[in-house]
Regions:
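Hydrophobic residues in well-ordered beta-strands that form the structural core
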Residues: 10, 60, 100, 125-127, ...
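Rossmann-fold dehydrogenase core element
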Residues: 113-130, 150-155
């Protein structure tokens, strides 16, 4: 570790595709407390290209070589979900602190094993549930804790995203439910995690998980591929606080209406709206206290923004907020949310929702 910064190595740092060029690279570039120190891709030529593009001193085409040779404070696993488990296991076995994209594993068992090993080795962990670092949700959580709308009675979450019918060849691998990158785990997982962050965890849940579009058109090849991955999730549940919850998240063909999260309390209402996924896009917060005729937009206090103004808006912003938090944790040897334990809790909820859908029974948590 440098005097004022942590050294980060990223596995999955390609220039042309993936999450690194869209979020991590532009985020870290503007973070004074985080140094992009090493890249690893699956091929030597792409690793060198990434190092040159990002201005990173070390390039590797084998992650084990990077783990053995690079002087790092944390390793980030930023690859497709099916590779999370293998790579994260190797990082943990090497004794490195770790950041892994969400979902932590392709299933609950993988998440349990990764969380157990991280605890056994006493390593610091973070998972890319970036809504937990988003200023709007941090502020919303605090408003709820301060009883801004009194006792929360119920909440409703809706998210509809377009484009389920057709995908480029690089994304049709997500058709297989076993690979773990589905509407249930990713869009729903991110959105329900933000809800739980603000309102608390579920005591019980009933779910309906289904695939409404059983074939995708693969662009460029012009072929149709069979799909087992779910695209529509509907749940009803009760939080440990007693609040009633309903949620409906779908990947639909056309004209998705975006995201809307409504919270109803004894003294008023809070609403979050977004045209995009709230974890990566811009959102607005509205409030309606008892006696008001209309909802009024709330400005998010600047104290919730922890990163420089030069960090780009969109996906890089909340990722930068996470890196700021993780840097603080590494420097102080303190684990902050969202950790592997946070991710494991979310995996357990997702598993319960799937079990409820499969069996037609309410699941207790």
């Amino acid at each position: 570790m440098g005097l004022n910064s942590i050294r980060v190595g990223i596995i999955g740092a390609n220039v042309g595709y993936g999450w690194t060029p869209r979020s991590h690279a532009p985020a870290i570039a503007e973070m004074p407390g985080v140094e992009f120190a090493a890249v690893c891709t699956s091929r030597e030529e792409t690793a060198k290209q990434s190092a040159d593009t990002y201005g990173v001193p070390l390039a590797f085409s084998n992650h084990k070589e990077m783990l053995n040779k690079a002087d790092l404070d944390v390793v980030a696993v930023v690859v497709r979900v099916p590779k999370h488990y293998e790579l994260a296991m190797d990082v943990l076995k090497s004794g490195q602190n770790i950041y892994t994209e969400w979902p932590l594993g392709a299933n609950l068992k993988e998440a349990e094993e990764l969380t157990a090993l991280a605890k056994e080795k006493n390593l610091l962990t973070m998972v890319g549930l970036q809504s937990r670092a988003a200023p709007i949700f941090m502020y919303l959580r605090d408003l709820i804790r301060e009883n801004y709308i009194g006792v929360v009675l119920s909440a409703s979450l809706r998210q509809f995203s377009s484009g389920v019918l057709s995908r480029p060849p690089g994304r049709t691998w997500q058709k297989d439910v076993e690979l773990g990158a589905t509407t249930l785990t990713i869009p729903f997982g991110h959105s329900i995690d933000a809800l739980c962050m603000c309102l608390g965890e579920f005591a019980s849940v009933s779910g309906n998980v289904s695939t409404k579009v059983p074939q995708w058109h693969e662009q460029e090849t012009n072929r149709m591929v069979e799909v087992s991955s779910p695209d529509t999730i509907m749940i009803n549940g009760t939080l440990k606080s007693g609040a009633a919850i309903s949620a409906h998240v779908s990947a639909i063909p056309h004209h998705g209406s975006g995201y809307r999260f409504e919270i109803y309390g004894t003294e008023g209402t809070l609403v979050v709206t977004s045209n995009d996924a709230p974890s990566t896009g811009s959102s607005k917060l509205w409030q309606g206290k008892a006696g008001q005729s209309d909802l009024v937009e709330l400005e998010i206090p600047k104290r919730y923004t922890k990163v420089p103004s030069s960090v780009p808006a969109g996906p890089p912003f909340n990722i930068a907020q996470l890196w700021d938090r993780f840097a603080e944790g590494i420097k102080s040897n303190t684990e902050f949310e969202p950790s592997f334990s946070t991710a494991l809790t979310r995996h357990k909820l997702i598993d319960a929702i799937q079990k409820s859908s499969d069996t037609g029974t309410t699941q207790e948590l």
